[in-house]
């Protein structure tokens, strides 16, 4: 995936759940009765997505004819072997890269019609990101990292909301610490605070537990699902963790550049094919 600064700056399957009722009273900084979602509509749609890159042996097709819809409040897991194109797809869906063919509509906006600054503003205001390696900016404090998307979106109460969000993840006492002064689990909790502080309609998570031990990873995942449940945020999750994938409403498998709905068993589970 691209560096997180690009996310914020210009530089089996169950059907989609009913549109959630957001427990706004439980979320710091969220006004009563205000939902960040467009109820009953897709927050993300990908149509006919292909991604090709040049190589020494000619053109390489990374993604081929990908179709995908995500409804408001829905959680979708994308699984598959390493190198299958999962993270590439996530970057395209988030507008961090552009497809060779096809269209991505994010929160009602055709990403192909937006310039880089417009994409960055859209992400800063309505989209959250969580990465495997945390992607916190090392020169900023935990508080400043959490404030970043709010400041880029022009929000006037960034400090207050960021402090409330850090308290919600149990790190208000670490607000002045820089990332290297924090443990891996603490860094990922700061990343979650940054991802959710803008009350996102959609969260992209790329292997969020990949650099954490099992116990810490489980706590981070519980926190992520708790926060998204309170806000009603949709989730697109790339993971190798089968237990984590099972917590989602739908599971899709990426293999050979193609995306397919997955049956009730995942590879490596009883009845599944090992990866």
Located regions from the model:
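ABC family nucleotide-binding domain
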Residues: 41-254
